[in-house]
Amino acid sequence: MSNVDHAEIAKFEALAHRWWDRESEFKPLHDINPLRVNWIDERAGLAGKKVLDIGCGGGILSEAMAQRGASVTGIDMGEAPLAVARLHQLESGVAVDYRQITAEQMAEEMPGQFDVVTCLEMLEHVPDPASVIRACHRLVKPGGQVFLSTINRNPKAYLFAVIGAEYILQLLPRGTHDFRKFIRPSELGAWSREAGLEVKDIIGLTYNPLTKHYKLANDVDVNYMVQTKREA
């Protein structure tokens, strides 16, 4: 059975044409992207690395990593977001290889081929996130790094990521997130270890509605990123 939620794919298909509009529903992704790329680059040294971006969508993270000197492949199951990513490539001139394929299929095809694997803001949109993490382990080279991000599952996360972001501040379209699919750091850590990935670091991402700025912080109550490594 394919690890794809077609309703989730449809959500982003409908919005795909606005992916690179920095004032659209994708503004939060644009705003947090520099923080995420810097955090990954500081730990992995992207220049010259072969990188796979799982759930790449319209290519915001993929292009940013390519601009840091990485050789990037971006994969997604959404046809419209990938079309937008390829179209934006023509405008930006940034080289990324985009493919419509699941992480699990890619792991069968190219095991152990990547220095770095990223899977950001994607795990909470698939039926079986642990399966994606196992695929990440198969895809990354021994000694390589896997970076994951998602949203914690607790009352504060529901208040901030669903009620606050979707209903009050209207940063995201209503229905973007399903609280039941949010993932606690303990769960993400357990799935990573079971897959053969060692958790090296964790950082939170917080939003100040007054200044409208995001920053990295030790608060992992809502959004957070995890650095993991496959044994050499």
Swiss-Prot record:
Pathway: Cofactor biosynthesis; ubiquinone biosynthesis
A Pfam family that the UniProt record links to this protein: Methyltransf_23
UniProt-annotated binding residues for S-adenosyl-L-methionine: 36, 55, 76, 120
Superkingdom per UniProt: Bacteria
BP terms from Gene Ontology: methylation
Keyword set includes Cell wall biogenesis/degradation: no
EC number: 2.1.1.222, 2.1.1.64
GO MF, any single term: methyltransferase activity
Assigned keywords, A-Z: Methyltransferase, S-adenosyl-L-methionine, Transferase, Ubiquinone biosynthesis
Signal peptide: none
Record's catalysed reaction(s): a 3-demethylubiquinol + S-adenosyl-L-methionine = a ubiquinol + S-adenosyl-L-homocysteine + H(+); a 3-(all-trans-polyprenyl)benzene-1,2-diol + S-adenosyl-L-methionine = a 2-methoxy-6-(all-trans-polyprenyl)phenol + S-adenosyl-L-homocysteine + H(+)
Family of this protein: Belongs to the methyltransferase superfamily. UbiG/COQ3 family.
Function: O-methyltransferase that catalyzes the 2 O-methylation steps in the ubiquinone biosynthetic pathway.
Protein name: Ubiquinone biosynthesis O-methyltransferase
Organism whose genome encodes this protein: Pseudomonas aeruginosa (strain ATCC 15692 / DSM 22644 / CIP 104116 / JCM 14847 / LMG 12228 / 1C / PRS 101 / PAO1)
Gene: ubiG
